[in-house]
Amino acid sequence: MFDAKNFLANVTHQPGVYRMFDEKGQVIYVGKAKDLKKRLSSYFRTNLNSKKTSALVSHIHSIETTITASETEALLLEHNYIKAFQPRYNVLLRDDKSYPYILLTKERHPRITSHRGSKKVQGEYFGPYPHAGAVRETLSLLQKLFPIRQCENSVYNNRSRPCLQYQIGRCSGPCIDGLVSDEEYQQQVDFARLFLQGKDQQVLEHLIKKMEQASMQLNFEQAAYFRDQIQAIRAVIEKQFVSNERLDDMDILAIAYQLGIACVQVLFIRQGKVLGNRSYFPKVPANTDLSELTETFVGQFYLQGHQGRIIPSTIIVDHVLNEKHELEVLLTEQAGRKVNIQDNVKGNKSKFLHLAQMNAQAALVTQLKQANLIQERYQALQELLSLTTIKRMECFDISHTMGEQTIASCVVFDTEGPLKSDYRRFNISGITAGDDYAAMEQALLKRYDRPLENEKIPDIIFIDGGKGQLNRALQVFAQLNVSWDKNKPLLIGVAKGVDRKAGLETLIISKQNKEVNLLPDSLALHLIQHIRDESHYHAIGGHRKKRQQAFTQSGLEAIKGVGAKRRQALLKYLGGMQGVKNATLAEISSVPGISAALAERIYETLRSE
């Protein structure tokens, strides 16, 4: 029993952060306070009006505090602790991929491309975009409007003739001397930059001026080119939703909450245009106040620096924040410029907020339907297998090409569906090519021949294969020498029918020693197909990546003495990989940095392939 009176006697009145632990020593809640003593004392009053707080207090075994120099410092430390410990009584934003941006590189002939992750490449970044599809769509549009290269530098540096993009008018061909001058190319780059900045009218004004100049100089072909470009840009502008009011870059956050599930909709506005939106479904403890949810989400969302998010000038929310000022100060510090949080907006901002609220509600309805369907499928599978509960399932699959570059995948489902943070791939080696049984054995040993926490022990393990694969899996488990309960998982083989069609699978249930054929409309079968397909796609994705690596290294980089620089020199001077393969020994020797001995090694290696 936690002795609150004795603990509180030694707590300071200074600002800081507190961490609450349960009897297992796990952090169950992280909070901050202007006055640690006052805040912590409030948890141990006789009458607590919050069910969430009552539940939290009943699990407290110990509390640790950290004094900070200011409330702002406490706020930042709180979010760092929440991210590190993932406490169950805090609102948790599930870790998310970084946002994609459009990158305009800083080179003699800049290229325009998508970028995700840390901004190490020199150039200008535009975004963020809500997902990769929005970036691809924008890049495709830019390619039609402005003939700027989108190719990788490895392709650009080794061209001896213009590519197909030049032939169809989507690139001006800066890789080949004489096709476009540096000035003309830079002009198109400047137009693309203005377009991405939302300055469409400036682009049109410049192009109209260019068209008129070309016409006055009787260069009608050039004038016609600019005319077509103007028409294409006008057609795009007409389709875009643009606010007439001058708006700063801003993100709009709206929350919808129902039946224990919260949806936070983030709408991205840049230069008055809607770039897109994204839905988030944070883990929310029961009876959480929506203002607290909004406050925590804003902090976690913008303070995860590794995500590469740019903090906009304005953040609009649909709930009043208790610590709005502290958040503004912290976000301003992080952004290096003034950041405003607004919760009472009018005009176009109000329209955008309403749009975000509608999207949040629509996404929540879809999520609730999906959650209900998953629960129904779990219930059906529990009844089929006579299990009281299923909390965690894992599924294995093997992928290879003619026995080469073998990859095994393991995907994990919990009661909410795919748990992608726990997905794993395993490189399989040291087996006979094409031996799927040995591959499965190696994957299972890598996964389970180690200590496991109780919550990580699966209730069901699906093996994608027939009796042979399942029997090999059972042998592996029989030989495991581990401290956790290896008899807990129910191993099930999922065998495809003779026609290998979905809906004709047979379940081979190990502990019940029976085979089950389910009807195509069975909810239990749909859940099994879902996890099996996830495992299959995960394995194929890993295999393709490994195969591509092997392919790129099978030529030059696999040769001892040929690194990235020498490989680039060979490709550049001999006109690509095919040129290297067709080159004579003397031609290879003439490449700068390639000695006679290395040239002979390259020549002999490529001839023997």
Swiss-Prot record:
Molecular function as annotated in GO: DNA binding; excinuclease ABC activity
List GO BP terms, alphabetically.
Answer: nucleotide-excision repair; SOS response
Would the keyword Plastid turn up in this protein's UniProt record?
A: no
Show where the GIY-YIG domain sits. 13-91
Q: Which GO terms describe its cellular component?
A: cytoplasm; excinuclease repair complex
Where found in the cell?
A: Cytoplasm
Q: Which InterPro entries match?
A: GIY-YIG_endonuc, GIY-YIG_endonuc_sf, GIY-YIG_UvrC_Cho, Hlx-hairpin-Hlx_DNA-bd_motif, RuvA_2-like, UVR_dom, UVR_dom_sf, UvrABC_protein_C
Q: Which UniProt keywords apply?
A: Cytoplasm, DNA damage, DNA excision, DNA repair, Excision nuclease, SOS response
Please name the Pfam families in this protein's record.
Answer: GIY-YIG, HHH_5, UVR, UvrC_RNaseH, UvrC_RNaseH_dom
Instruction: Name the predominant localization.
Output: cytoplasm
Q: Where does the record place the UVR domain?
A: 201-236
- Is Cytoplasm tagged as a keyword? yes
User: What's the family?
Assistant: Belongs to the UvrC family.
Describe its partners and assembly state.
Answer: Interacts with UvrB in an incision complex.
Q: Which NCBIfam families match?
A: PRK00558.1-5, uvrC
This molecule's function is given as: The UvrABC repair system catalyzes the recognition and processing of DNA lesions. UvrC both incises the 5' and 3' sides of the lesion. The N-terminal half is responsible for the 3' incision and the C-terminal half is responsible for the 5' incision.
Q: What name has this protein been given in UniProt?
A: UvrABC system protein C
> Could you tell me the gene encoding this protein?
uvrC
